[in-house]
Amino acid sequence: MKLAVLTGGGDAPGLNAVIRGVVRKATENGDEVIGFLDGWRGVMENEFMELDVEGCRGLLTRGGTVLGTTRINPFMREDGRDACRRTLEANGVDALIAIGGEGTLSCAHEMYKLGFPVLGVPKTIDNDIGSTEMTFGFATAVDIATEAIGRLHTTAESHDRVMVVEVMGRHVGHIATWAGLAGGASLTLIPEHPFDIAEVADALQRRHKRKFASIVVVAEGAKPVPGTLDIPEDSFDEFGHIKLGGIGELVAREITERTGFETRTTVRGYVQRGGEPSAFDRVLATWYGVEAASMAADKAFGQMVAYQCGSMTRVDLGEAVAGLKYVNPDLYKVASTFMA
Protein backbone atom coordinates (compact mmCIF):
# COMPACT_ATOMS: atom_id res chain seq x y z
CA MET A 1 0.00 0.00 0.00
CA LYS A 2 1.25 3.51 -0.78
CA LEU A 3 0.43 6.32 1.65
CA ALA A 4 0.81 10.06 1.14
CA VAL A 5 0.90 12.77 3.80
CA LEU A 6 0.40 16.52 3.61
CA THR A 7 0.43 19.32 6.20
CA GLY A 8 -1.76 22.36 5.57
CA GLY A 9 -2.67 25.64 7.22
CA GLY A 10 -0.68 27.25 10.02
CA ASP A 11 2.20 25.37 11.57
CA ALA A 12 1.93 23.85 15.03
CA PRO A 13 4.35 22.16 17.42
CA GLY A 14 4.07 18.40 16.85
CA LEU A 15 3.52 18.28 13.08
CA ASN A 16 6.81 16.50 12.51
CA ALA A 17 6.04 14.05 15.29
CA VAL A 18 2.81 13.11 13.49
CA ILE A 19 4.71 12.54 10.25
CA ARG A 20 7.23 10.39 12.11
CA GLY A 21 4.41 8.36 13.68
CA VAL A 22 2.78 7.75 10.30
CA VAL A 23 6.04 6.62 8.74
CA ARG A 24 7.02 4.28 11.58
CA LYS A 25 3.63 2.55 11.68
CA ALA A 26 3.31 2.40 7.89
CA THR A 27 6.78 0.88 7.61
CA GLU A 28 5.83 -1.70 10.23
CA ASN A 29 2.80 -2.52 8.06
CA GLY A 30 5.00 -2.88 4.99
CA ASP A 31 3.64 0.29 3.38
CA GLU A 32 5.44 3.01 1.40
CA VAL A 33 5.07 6.70 2.32
CA ILE A 34 5.56 9.95 0.42
CA GLY A 35 4.98 13.50 1.63
CA PHE A 36 3.48 16.21 -0.55
CA LEU A 37 5.19 19.57 -0.20
CA ASP A 38 3.44 22.73 0.97
CA GLY A 39 0.03 21.25 1.63
CA TRP A 40 -2.43 20.96 -1.23
CA ARG A 41 -0.03 22.84 -3.52
CA GLY A 42 2.24 19.81 -3.62
CA VAL A 43 -0.68 17.58 -4.56
CA MET A 44 -1.80 19.90 -7.36
CA GLU A 45 1.72 20.35 -8.72
CA ASN A 46 2.94 16.80 -8.10
CA GLU A 47 5.78 17.81 -5.79
CA PHE A 48 6.68 15.39 -3.03
CA MET A 49 9.49 13.72 -1.13
CA GLU A 50 10.04 10.12 -0.11
CA LEU A 51 9.58 9.45 3.59
CA ASP A 52 11.29 6.60 5.44
CA VAL A 53 12.32 5.76 8.98
CA GLU A 54 15.90 6.92 8.51
CA GLY A 55 14.77 10.26 7.11
CA CYS A 56 12.50 10.84 10.10
CA ARG A 57 15.29 10.73 12.67
CA GLY A 58 15.17 13.81 14.88
CA LEU A 59 11.64 14.78 13.92
CA LEU A 60 10.09 13.97 17.29
CA THR A 61 11.37 17.16 18.93
CA ARG A 62 11.61 19.37 15.86
CA GLY A 63 9.12 22.22 15.45
CA GLY A 64 7.46 23.23 12.20
CA THR A 65 6.95 20.75 9.36
CA VAL A 66 9.59 19.27 7.07
CA LEU A 67 6.97 19.08 4.33
CA GLY A 68 6.20 22.79 4.40
CA THR A 69 2.70 24.20 4.60
CA THR A 70 0.43 26.68 2.82
CA ARG A 71 -3.20 27.73 3.02
CA ILE A 72 -3.89 26.87 -0.62
CA ASN A 73 -7.36 25.51 -1.35
CA PRO A 74 -7.52 23.34 -4.49
CA PHE A 75 -11.22 24.09 -4.86
CA MET A 76 -10.35 27.78 -5.28
CA ARG A 77 -7.84 27.09 -8.08
CA GLU A 78 -8.66 26.45 -11.71
CA ASP A 79 -8.21 22.74 -12.41
CA GLY A 80 -7.13 22.24 -8.78
CA ARG A 81 -9.39 19.31 -8.07
CA ASP A 82 -8.54 17.49 -11.30
CA ALA A 83 -4.83 18.20 -10.82
CA CYS A 84 -5.01 16.50 -7.42
CA ARG A 85 -6.70 13.49 -8.97
CA ARG A 86 -4.06 13.19 -11.68
CA THR A 87 -1.24 13.38 -9.13
CA LEU A 88 -2.67 10.70 -6.86
CA GLU A 89 -3.37 8.37 -9.78
CA ALA A 90 0.04 8.96 -11.40
CA ASN A 91 1.85 8.08 -8.17
CA GLY A 92 -0.35 5.15 -7.24
CA VAL A 93 -1.41 6.69 -3.93
CA ASP A 94 -3.80 4.40 -2.07
CA ALA A 95 -4.46 6.71 0.88
CA LEU A 96 -3.90 10.42 1.52
CA ILE A 97 -3.52 11.60 5.11
CA ALA A 98 -4.33 15.31 5.43
CA ILE A 99 -2.99 16.91 8.61
CA GLY A 100 -4.52 20.29 9.25
CA GLY A 101 -7.14 22.52 10.74
CA GLU A 102 -10.63 23.45 9.69
CA GLY A 103 -9.66 24.61 6.19
CA THR A 104 -7.41 21.68 5.32
CA LEU A 105 -9.83 19.12 6.71
CA SER A 106 -12.80 20.72 4.95
CA CYS A 107 -10.89 20.29 1.67
CA ALA A 108 -10.16 16.70 2.62
CA HIS A 109 -13.84 16.07 3.27
CA GLU A 110 -14.82 17.54 -0.11
CA MET A 111 -12.16 15.40 -1.79
CA TYR A 112 -13.53 12.31 -0.08
CA LYS A 113 -17.03 13.10 -1.33
CA LEU A 114 -15.57 13.13 -4.85
CA GLY A 115 -14.13 9.66 -4.36
CA PHE A 116 -10.61 10.45 -3.15
CA PRO A 117 -9.13 8.00 -0.57
CA VAL A 118 -8.62 10.69 2.08
CA LEU A 119 -8.58 10.72 5.89
CA GLY A 120 -7.74 13.45 8.37
CA VAL A 121 -5.62 14.30 11.40
CA PRO A 122 -6.72 17.41 13.37
CA LYS A 123 -4.11 20.12 13.82
CA THR A 124 -4.56 23.52 15.46
CA ILE A 125 -3.04 25.25 18.45
CA ASP A 126 -6.47 26.83 19.02
CA ASN A 127 -7.94 23.40 19.97
CA ASP A 128 -11.21 24.35 18.28
CA ILE A 129 -11.88 21.34 16.04
CA GLY A 130 -15.04 19.49 16.95
CA SER A 131 -15.16 15.78 17.81
CA THR A 132 -11.70 15.72 19.39
CA GLU A 133 -10.93 16.78 22.95
CA MET A 134 -7.34 17.80 22.33
CA THR A 135 -5.29 18.78 19.29
CA PHE A 136 -1.50 18.59 19.34
CA GLY A 137 0.23 21.95 19.62
CA PHE A 138 -2.37 23.35 22.00
CA ALA A 139 -0.54 22.29 25.17
CA THR A 140 2.71 23.82 23.91
CA ALA A 141 0.96 27.09 23.05
CA VAL A 142 -0.58 27.18 26.54
CA ASP A 143 2.83 26.56 28.12
CA ILE A 144 4.37 29.44 26.14
CA ALA A 145 1.56 31.83 27.01
CA THR A 146 1.59 30.77 30.66
CA GLU A 147 5.32 31.39 30.94
CA ALA A 148 4.87 34.89 29.53
CA ILE A 149 2.10 35.66 32.02
CA GLY A 150 4.24 34.39 34.88
CA ARG A 151 7.17 36.59 33.88
CA LEU A 152 4.97 39.66 33.51
CA HIS A 153 3.64 39.38 37.07
CA THR A 154 6.92 40.70 38.46
CA THR A 155 6.98 43.63 36.05
CA ALA A 156 3.38 44.53 36.83
CA GLU A 157 4.06 44.38 40.57
CA SER A 158 7.34 46.32 40.40
CA HIS A 159 5.82 49.21 38.45
CA ASP A 160 2.23 48.94 39.69
CA ARG A 161 1.12 48.52 36.09
CA VAL A 162 -1.62 46.72 34.26
CA MET A 163 -0.16 44.27 31.75
CA VAL A 164 -2.35 43.18 28.83
CA VAL A 165 -1.27 39.90 27.22
CA GLU A 166 -2.80 39.10 23.84
CA VAL A 167 -2.72 35.43 22.85
CA MET A 168 -3.97 33.52 19.83
CA GLY A 169 -7.58 32.48 19.49
CA ARG A 170 -9.49 34.07 16.62
CA HIS A 171 -12.81 32.30 17.16
CA VAL A 172 -12.40 30.53 20.52
CA GLY A 173 -10.60 31.24 23.77
CA HIS A 174 -9.09 27.91 24.78
CA ILE A 175 -5.50 29.20 24.95
CA ALA A 176 -6.52 32.34 26.82
CA THR A 177 -8.68 30.45 29.31
CA TRP A 178 -6.12 27.76 30.09
CA ALA A 179 -3.11 30.10 30.17
CA GLY A 180 -5.00 32.72 32.15
CA LEU A 181 -6.00 30.17 34.76
CA ALA A 182 -2.54 28.55 34.88
CA GLY A 183 -0.74 31.89 34.94
CA GLY A 184 -2.90 33.56 37.58
CA ALA A 185 -4.40 36.24 35.33
CA SER A 186 -6.57 38.92 36.89
CA LEU A 187 -9.02 38.93 33.97
CA THR A 188 -9.40 36.76 30.87
CA LEU A 189 -11.34 38.00 27.84
CA ILE A 190 -12.40 35.46 25.20
CA PRO A 191 -14.54 35.46 22.02
CA GLU A 192 -17.26 33.33 23.63
CA HIS A 193 -18.03 36.01 26.24
CA PRO A 194 -18.23 39.60 24.91
CA PHE A 195 -16.79 42.02 27.46
CA ASP A 196 -17.94 45.40 28.74
CA ILE A 197 -14.87 47.62 28.95
CA ALA A 198 -16.46 49.65 31.77
CA GLU A 199 -16.78 46.49 33.87
CA VAL A 200 -13.16 45.60 33.06
CA ALA A 201 -12.01 49.02 34.26
CA ASP A 202 -14.10 48.82 37.44
CA ALA A 203 -12.70 45.38 38.28
CA LEU A 204 -9.12 46.62 37.86
CA GLN A 205 -9.77 49.65 40.06
CA ARG A 206 -11.06 47.37 42.81
CA ARG A 207 -7.90 45.26 42.55
CA HIS A 208 -5.59 48.24 42.75
CA LYS A 209 -7.37 49.56 45.83
CA ARG A 210 -6.16 46.33 47.45
CA LYS A 211 -2.64 47.09 46.18
CA PHE A 212 -2.76 44.31 43.58
CA ALA A 213 -1.11 44.72 40.18
CA SER A 214 -3.04 43.20 37.29
CA ILE A 215 -2.58 40.90 34.29
CA VAL A 216 -5.33 40.92 31.66
CA VAL A 217 -5.24 38.05 29.15
CA VAL A 218 -7.04 38.77 25.87
CA ALA A 219 -7.70 36.28 23.08
CA GLU A 220 -7.10 37.94 19.70
CA GLY A 221 -10.74 37.36 18.77
CA ALA A 222 -12.22 38.77 21.98
CA LYS A 223 -15.14 41.09 21.26
CA PRO A 224 -16.66 43.95 23.22
CA VAL A 225 -20.36 44.09 23.96
CA PRO A 226 -21.85 46.04 21.02
CA GLY A 227 -21.81 49.75 21.66
CA THR A 228 -19.42 49.65 24.63
CA LEU A 229 -16.13 50.27 22.82
CA ASP A 230 -15.34 52.43 19.80
CA ILE A 231 -13.06 50.53 17.43
CA PRO A 232 -11.25 52.55 14.70
CA GLU A 233 -11.91 51.37 11.15
CA ASP A 234 -8.19 50.77 10.49
CA SER A 235 -8.18 48.17 13.29
CA PHE A 236 -9.94 45.63 11.03
CA ASP A 237 -8.49 43.42 8.30
CA GLU A 238 -10.14 42.65 4.94
CA PHE A 239 -12.25 39.90 6.51
CA GLY A 240 -13.68 42.15 9.20
CA HIS A 241 -11.50 40.69 11.97
CA ILE A 242 -9.63 42.92 14.40
CA LYS A 243 -5.96 42.73 13.38
CA LEU A 244 -3.50 40.68 15.40
CA GLY A 245 -2.26 42.97 18.14
CA GLY A 246 -5.31 45.16 17.69
CA ILE A 247 -7.67 44.13 20.47
CA GLY A 248 -4.90 44.03 23.07
CA GLU A 249 -3.84 47.59 22.25
CA LEU A 250 -7.44 48.80 22.25
CA VAL A 251 -8.13 47.25 25.64
CA ALA A 252 -4.91 48.68 27.09
CA ARG A 253 -5.70 52.16 25.79
CA GLU A 254 -9.20 52.08 27.24
CA ILE A 255 -7.94 50.85 30.61
CA THR A 256 -5.50 53.76 30.81
CA GLU A 257 -8.13 56.31 29.80
CA ARG A 258 -10.75 54.98 32.22
CA THR A 259 -8.53 54.27 35.25
CA GLY A 260 -5.38 56.32 34.84
CA PHE A 261 -3.29 53.18 35.41
CA GLU A 262 -0.13 52.80 33.38
CA THR A 263 -0.88 49.92 31.01
CA ARG A 264 1.38 47.96 28.66
CA THR A 265 0.58 45.38 25.98
CA THR A 266 2.45 42.21 25.04
CA VAL A 267 1.41 40.23 21.95
CA ARG A 268 2.64 36.64 22.03
CA GLY A 269 1.77 36.13 18.37
CA TYR A 270 3.47 33.48 16.31
CA VAL A 271 5.91 32.45 19.02
CA GLN A 272 3.04 30.27 20.27
CA ARG A 273 3.31 28.21 17.08
CA GLY A 274 7.07 27.83 17.00
CA GLY A 275 9.79 25.74 18.53
CA GLU A 276 9.86 22.30 20.08
CA PRO A 277 6.60 20.64 21.12
CA SER A 278 6.09 19.92 24.81
CA ALA A 279 6.44 16.36 26.11
CA PHE A 280 2.65 16.00 26.11
CA ASP A 281 2.36 17.18 22.51
CA ARG A 282 5.14 14.83 21.39
CA VAL A 283 3.22 11.88 22.78
CA LEU A 284 -0.16 13.08 21.49
CA ALA A 285 1.16 13.87 18.01
CA THR A 286 2.93 10.51 17.76
CA TRP A 287 -0.27 8.75 18.78
CA TYR A 288 -2.22 10.65 16.13
CA GLY A 289 0.31 9.64 13.47
CA VAL A 290 0.35 5.95 14.37
CA GLU A 291 -3.45 5.80 14.45
CA ALA A 292 -3.67 7.59 11.08
CA ALA A 293 -1.44 4.95 9.48
CA SER A 294 -3.61 2.23 11.01
CA MET A 295 -6.73 3.93 9.62
CA ALA A 296 -5.15 4.02 6.17
CA ALA A 297 -4.40 0.30 6.40
CA ASP A 298 -8.07 -0.26 7.29
CA LYS A 299 -9.16 1.97 4.38
CA ALA A 300 -11.10 4.12 6.86
CA PHE A 301 -11.48 6.95 4.38
CA GLY A 302 -13.68 9.95 5.05
CA GLN A 303 -12.83 9.73 8.75
CA MET A 304 -10.65 11.70 11.16
CA VAL A 305 -8.53 10.53 14.07
CA ALA A 306 -9.94 11.93 17.32
CA TYR A 307 -8.75 11.96 20.92
CA GLN A 308 -11.65 11.21 23.24
CA CYS A 309 -11.74 10.06 26.88
CA GLY A 310 -8.03 9.30 26.92
CA SER A 311 -8.02 7.15 23.78
CA MET A 312 -7.86 7.53 20.02
CA THR A 313 -11.01 6.87 18.04
CA ARG A 314 -12.37 7.50 14.55
CA VAL A 315 -15.07 10.02 13.67
CA ASP A 316 -16.79 11.16 10.51
CA LEU A 317 -14.70 13.87 8.83
CA GLY A 318 -17.77 15.84 7.84
CA GLU A 319 -19.06 15.94 11.40
CA ALA A 320 -15.63 16.97 12.68
CA VAL A 321 -15.51 20.11 10.52
CA ALA A 322 -19.20 20.98 10.87
CA GLY A 323 -18.67 23.37 13.77
CA LEU A 324 -16.14 24.83 16.18
CA LYS A 325 -15.48 23.55 19.69
CA TYR A 326 -15.94 26.35 22.19
CA VAL A 327 -14.55 26.82 25.69
CA ASN A 328 -16.32 24.67 28.26
CA PRO A 329 -18.56 27.07 30.22
CA ASP A 330 -17.77 25.22 33.45
CA LEU A 331 -14.04 25.77 32.95
CA TYR A 332 -14.58 29.45 32.26
CA LYS A 333 -16.60 29.67 35.48
CA VAL A 334 -13.60 28.22 37.31
CA ALA A 335 -11.36 30.85 35.72
CA SER A 336 -13.90 33.56 36.60
CA THR A 337 -13.64 32.60 40.27
CA PHE A 338 -10.12 34.03 40.28
CA MET A 339 -10.83 37.11 38.17
CA ALA A 340 -10.42 40.58 39.69
Residue ranges of model-derived segments:
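Short glycine/serine/threonine-rich phosphate/pyrophosphate-binding segments
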Residues: 12-22, 44, 78-82, 96-109, ...
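Flexible, glycine/charged-enriched surface loops at secondary-structure junctions
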Residues: 31-36, 155-162, 214-216, 252, ...
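Short, acidic/small-residue loops that bind anionic groups at enzyme active sites
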Residues: 30, 34-37, 111-144, 189-196
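N-terminal phosphate-binding or glycine-rich loops at protein starts, especially the Walker A/P-loop
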Residues: 1-44
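Glycine-rich oxoanion-binding loops at beta->alpha junctions
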Residues: 43-96, 103-104, 136-143, 147, ...
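Accessory alpha-helical/coil subdomains and C-terminal extensions
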Residues: 95-100, 106, 110, 138-156, ...
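Phosphate-binding loop/pocket of nucleotide- and phosphate-handling active sites
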Residues: 250, 303-340
